[in-house]
Amino acid sequence: MALAQLDIFEKMRGLYTPVMGIRRKVLVAVARLIREGRPPQAIEHIPYDIITHNTPTYRDCIFKERAVARERVRLALGQDLREFGAHEPIIDHPEPSLTTHRVVEKPYVAVIKIACERCARKSYVVSDQCMGCVARPCLNVCSKNAVKVTQGRSKIDRDKCVNCGRCAQVCPYNAILYRERPCESACGVDAIVADAEGFAEINNDTCVSCGLCVVSCPFGAIGEKSEMAQVLHAIRSGLPVWAELAPSFVGQFGPLATPQKILAAVRALGFAGTAEVAYGADIAILEEGEKVLEVFRERQADPAASRTFVGTSCCPSWVRAARHAFPDLATCIQDSSTPMVETAKRIKAQV
């Protein structure tokens, strides 16, 4: 029996891939630089510390692999990406990134264009599994005459094809494949388009920073900014920085890392204390309950009140996506602080 088809963002979710490995190596290198107190100029050496060999592993050449790593270092420092093709230092003035204050600004998610392979967009293509059968159902069902037979095999005319998928649906050998750009297909708000040269581009007016494109790109061409550098610099500067732990931390590092060991490691990193995000989740639930009661009171006072329900989520991306998709219901969709934010409020009030 054939396995169930997975959505595009489900295909790599939960898998440890080289893309994830490279991302972690960059973050580790940046963290080590800050904790060891190395000079800011050492940032330029990070791509060479990560990629020590002289032959490419995943891309056309070693220079391209290091160029991608350079852009990932910028993201790890909370900086915007360089324009494609700009030959400049990773950070012109590193000091603003090595600070205890927030430096991250929108956009939070960006395309590393030198890593983008300009994947084919949504289209159908005949594979070498075509048997050149006599029935030729693919040709018969195409209302646009986009399927032709060349040298005994079916071929799709891209200029005529409208991507309806009927040919793939009726092929007895499943020889017609559906191709899609993973990042574009994973985006639920249609924020990813192709620029004039075919590279992926994010429409920041539409993007909700959910990160589905980040986990769906097999080439690691989309990344997110990090505030790790500023947090570590704050710890190194002696500021009281607390770590918030979600309930899932129990299984984050495998069965050998007990909660006691993880808490000890957090303290060893220099955090002043720890707090459970679950507390913030309880507070968020209580606040959402109050918002539901507000709607009930409004309806009791005026049965014709505009708000008929309350849409709530502690995910900011969900709230932005819902308001974008249903602008006429925007008043019914409430802002809810994430459990992380509610926990942070408690920490700041007590410390």
PLM feature spans:
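Iron-sulfur-associated redox domains of electron-transfer enzymes in respiratory
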Residues: M1-R82, E224-V351
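Ferredoxin-type iron-sulfur electron-transfer modules and their immediate structural context
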Residues: A2-V170, N174-A186
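A short alpha-helix capping/helix-coil boundary motif
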Residues: K106-P107, C116-C119, V162, I192-V193, ...
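Glycine- and small hydrophobic-enriched segments that form the cores of compact globular domains
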Residues: A120-G211, V215, S226-E227, S237-G238, ...
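Switch II (G3) loop of P-loop NTPases
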Residues: P218
